[in-house]
Each structure stands twice: as structure tokens, then as C-alpha cells.
Amino acid sequence: MNTWKEAIGQEKQQPYFQHILQQVQQARQSGRTIYPPQEEVFSAFRLTEFDQVRVVILGQDPYHGVNQAHGLAFSVKPGIAPPPSLVNIYKELSTDIMGFQTPSHGYLVGWAKQGVLLLNTVLTVEQGLAHSHANFGWETFTDRVIHVLNEQRDHLVFLLWGSHAQKKGQFIDRTKHCVLTSPHPSPLSAHRGFFGCRHFSKTNQYLRHHNLTEINWQLPMTI
């Protein structure tokens, strides 16, 4: 099983999935602004193929500010200032990874292309309304994504930040995957244990131990 199409393609035929797409389409057609744009809703899967996944970082729902979201958890489009949670992720990286330099942008495509699946548990949101699509059915789909990664792949690293992600990943088999948990990097909770969690170096330690290529967490300084 190498591709997302092989792994979860059948989900797209399921009535619940068709219902999600209908609800999102209706919201767009009613004139509401929905993020990310239609062509970027599934960017995480396009940029990180199923057999290339080495690390999974779970987010919640997309950023709901103007032109921030582009389909990757925690990432923003070029030209958009890194949001507070991402600023804190960079802070932790700068203390955890020797030589890490904080980029001026928040565009995390460089991680996605190395096998870091940046997966939000809900894939769409209405502008200015956090969690507005939380009941659309996306959670069923992303549960299935995590389930198939858990079953069909070995030696993945799951980074679960905050109670929502931890609850979502509670069924992951800890005997064949590495599961790292901490509080969410949001300014509300980062000081409770996200700072100092060293998840990025621990990820590479685990990958190295299993003779897998480490992640180069350094991003280009500018985009």
C-alpha cells in the first residue's frame, strides 16, 4: 500500500464523506468565505504521500483568519506572519535543535515534503469562526486516516499536542509507533510543558534508532 488512494480512496465513496463535501460546497455557494480554498483542502495528502509519511503532527481546525490556511496544520501561506502557536513551535525548535534559525515566515511545506504529515482533524472552517465546521463529519475521515497509518505503517512518530490531539490518537499502537505528547503550543498552554518537550530532537532520535532518515527541521529563512 503506497498511495493515499489505495489507503483511504474508498472513504470518498462513503455517504458521510459525500455529505461533508456537500455541506462545504453549500457554505461556499451561500457566499460565506471558507478556508482553505477548495483546491487546498487536501494539500496535506498531496504533499506527503502515504508511503512517505514518517511523522504526523495533528492540528485541530484550519486557521480562520484572512488567507492564512492552505491545508497544512500550523502552516500559513507565504507573506502571512506566523501565528502565535507557530511562533512557539519555532521557539521550542530553537532551544531543541542546535543551530535552528527562526524563519521570517510560517510556510511549512519544507517539512511536508520530507514526510511530515501536517494533519488538521477538521479540514475546513468559516472565516472568523473557529470550530464552525467541527460537526461536518471531518473527524470521521481523519480518524480513518490515523487508523490506516497506525495499521499499515511501522515506526511512525506521532506528535500529539494538547488534549484534542491526544484523545484523537489514543488508539495508536505504542508498541510499533512512537507517540510523543505535550500541552498545545498555544500561548495559553505552551508554558505548561510544550516548552522543553524536545519533541523535534526526540523524533529524530527515534527515526535514527530505526535506521530511518531524520527530518531536517530547518526551513528556508525567507520564501
From Swiss-Prot:
Its annotated compartments are: Cytoplasm
Keywords (alphabetical) are: Cytoplasm, DNA damage, DNA repair, Hydrolase
Q: What class of enzyme is it?
A: hydrolase
Q: Which domain of life is it from?
A: Bacteria
Note the PROSITE patterns from the entry: U_DNA_GLYCOSYLASE
Which reaction does this enzyme catalyse, per its entry? Hydrolyzes single-stranded DNA or mismatched double-stranded DNA and polynucleotides, releasing free uracil
**A cellular-component GO term for this protein:** cytoplasm
Keyword flag Hydrolase: yes
List where the protein spans the membrane.
none
Tell me the active site. D61
Q: Name one Pfam family in it.
A: UDG
In the UniProt record, the signal sequence range is: none
Gene3D superfamilies associated with the record: Uracil-DNA glycosylase-like domain
Q: Give EC number(s), comma-separated.
A: 3.2.2.27
What's one GO BP annotation on this UniProt entry? base-excision repair, AP site formation via deaminated base removal
InterPro entries tied to this protein = UDG_fam1, Ura-DNA_Glyclase_AS, Uracil-DNA_glycosylase-like, Uracil-DNA_glycosylase-like_sf
GO MF annotation, one:
uracil DNA N-glycosylase activity
UniProt function note? Excises uracil residues from the DNA which can arise as a result of misincorporation of dUMP residues by DNA polymerase or due to deamination of cytosine.
- State the family it belongs to: Belongs to the uracil-DNA glycosylase (UDG) superfamily. UNG family.
Q: Which HAMAP family match?
A: UDG
Name of this protein: Uracil-DNA glycosylase
Question: Origin organism of this chain?
Answer: Histophilus somni (strain 2336)
